[in-house]
Amino acid sequence: MGVHFNICLLLLLVATISSQTLKATEKDDSTDENPFGIYRRGSQCAVYGGRCIPTSVRCPPNTFQCDLSGCSWSERCCCHL
C-alpha cells in the first residue's frame, strides 16, 4: 500500500512539473506590446516629425529642442530644422 501511494505521488509530481513547463514555454503576447510607443506615435512631438530624446543627450544634428507634448518626464522633443 505504501509503495502504491508513493508511486501515485510521484506521478502527480511529474504531471504538475510537466504542466508548469508547458505554461512557461507558451509565448506571452503582453510583453510585445509597448503602450508608450503607441502613445508617442500620436503625440504632438511625433505628428510634427519630432523624436523623444533623453534629457541627458543633446538633440541630434539638424534638430532643435521644441516644446511639444508627448514625451515622458525624462525626455524632451527634438524637431527637425
Curated annotation (Swiss-Prot):
GO CC, one annotated term: nematocyst
Designated name of the protein: Small cysteine-rich protein 1 1
Keyword Disulfide bond: yes
Subcellular location: Secreted; Nematocyst
Family: Belongs to the Cnidaria small cysteine-rich protein (SCRiP) family. alpha subfamily.
Keywords: Cleavage on pair of basic residues, Disulfide bond, Nematocyst, Neurotoxin, Secreted, Signal, Toxin
Single GO molecular function: toxin activity
Keyword match Secreted: yes
Role description: Induces neurotoxic symptoms on zebrafish. Has also been claimed to be implied in calcification, but tests on homolog proteins suggest that proteins of this family have a neurotoxic function and not a calcification function.
Primary location class: secreted
Disulphide-bridged cysteine pairs: none
Propeptide residues according to the Swiss-Prot or TrEMBL record: 20-39
Record PTM text: The basic myotoxic domain of rattlesnake crotamine toxins (with 6 Cys residues) has been detected in this protein. However, this protein contains 2 additional Cys at the C-terminal region. Hence, this protein may contain 4 disulfide bonds instead of the 3 suggested by the myotoxin domain.
Signal peptide: 1-19
